[in-house]
Structures are given as structure tokens and as C-alpha cells.
């Protein structure tokens, strides 16, 4: 009986094509409103990630509604942690990087869902978050959008962009999907 149960547990993993798992890890995460997804290199088990979760749960911009136990969720297969944040508080991106490093891992990327407005300063596009104090530098803006447009965006931030970035500073964004109008 034990062998039969073991067979049913192991069989799906043996028949899963290796490319299916690789494709899942290559797809960008899509954050929901109020979420900050932290992608980390090197997370292989939940025991290893316990210290990392604890470090991230201590950060100041966490949602006040959530406790330390429920504030950070982890998906071991993808190496992604989901944090719920208070949008009214500025995010200390460097503190995220430091917390991940203290946990013994390397920060790869951050994913966020934002609502805010576009602005153009010195020929560069900025996305200012509606509820918070965070500003993000955009490389390009889709056609049809203009200064002061209300937008909703899914952004990806590379780990190198957050090094030494303090709350309130403009954070460069690696890739972005912007739609006109706010739809939270």
C-alpha cells in the first residue's frame, strides 16, 4: 500500500516535462493591488526561507492589518514571496534588499501593481503612486497616454535598481504594462 501511495505521489513529477517547470519560473509574476512580490534566488525549502520571511515581515511598509505570520507568503517552486503593503507608506527598497541578504539569499526582482498618474520631468516619464509617496522612472509610455493621465500599471523592478534606494527616491523600472484609467 505504501508503495502504491508513493507511486501516485512521485509519478506526476516524473511525467512533468522539464520545460513546463522552466517556463513557469521564467514567467513574470503579476501582483494584485496592495501586493509586492519579491523574487529571490536560492530559495529551495520552506525551512531555509523562514528567516527570510521573518526579516521581510519586520519592514515598516507592511500592511498594519496583517500579523508577522500572515504578512509574507512564499512559493518555493518560483522563489517568490508575496508581501501585503500599506500603500500610504513609502517603500524602502534598499531595506528589502538588505532583508533578503540577511536571510542568506539574493534579490532578483520585485513586481508591483500600481495606481497613479503620469508626469514628465526633464523629458523623462514618472509614475507617481496615487496613495503612496513612491515614484517610478519609466523608459517609455504607450501611445495615447499623456501627462497627468490616471493609470494602472504592473511593473517589474530589477534588483540592481533598488540598491541604495531610499524611501521617496525615484526607482527605475525594468518593464511595465500600463493601462489608462484606475481600476482597483
Task: Please name every model-derived segment.
Residues 1-4:
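Positively charged n-region of N-terminal signal peptides that target proteins for export
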Residues 20-22:
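Boundary at the C-terminal end of the N-terminal hydrophobic targeting segment
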Residues 38-64:
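Short, thiol/selenol-centered motifs that function as redox-active sites or metal-ligating centers
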Residues 52-55, 94-104:
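Short amphipathic alpha-helices in soluble, non-transmembrane regions
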Residues 132-147:
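Beta-strand/loop nucleic-acid-binding surfaces
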Amino acid at each position: 500500500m505504501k508503495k502504491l501511495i508513493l507511486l501516485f505521489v512521485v509519478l506526476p513529477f516524473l511525467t512533468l516535462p522539464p520545460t513546463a517547470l522552466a517556463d513557469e519560473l521564467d514567467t513574470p509574476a503579476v501582483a494584485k493591488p496592495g501586493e509586492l512580490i519579491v523574487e529571490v534566488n536560492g530559495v529551495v525549502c520552506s525551512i531555509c526561507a523562514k528567516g527570510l520571511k521573518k526579516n521581510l515581515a519586520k519592514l515598516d511598509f507592511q500592511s498594519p492589518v496583517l500579523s508577522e505570520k500572515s504578512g509574507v507568503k512564499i512559493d518555493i517552486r518560483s522563489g517568490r514571496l508575496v508581501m501585503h503593503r500599506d500603500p500610504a507608506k513609502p517603500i524602502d527598497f534598499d531595506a528589502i534588499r538588505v532583508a533578503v541578504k540577511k536571510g542568506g539569499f539574493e534579490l532578483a526582482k520585485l513586481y508591483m501593481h500600481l495606481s497613479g498618474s503620469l508626469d514628465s520631468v526633464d523629458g523623462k516619464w514618472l509614475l507617481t503612486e496615487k496613495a503612496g509617496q513612491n515614484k517610478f522612472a519609466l523608459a517609455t509610455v504607450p501611445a495615447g497616454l499623456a501627462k497627468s493621465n490616471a493609470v494602472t500599471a504592473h511593473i517589474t523592478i530589477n534588483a540592481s535598481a533598488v540598491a541604495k534606494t531610499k524611501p521617496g527616491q525615484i526607482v527605475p523600472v525594468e518593464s511595465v504594462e500600463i493601462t489608462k484609467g484606475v481600476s482597483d
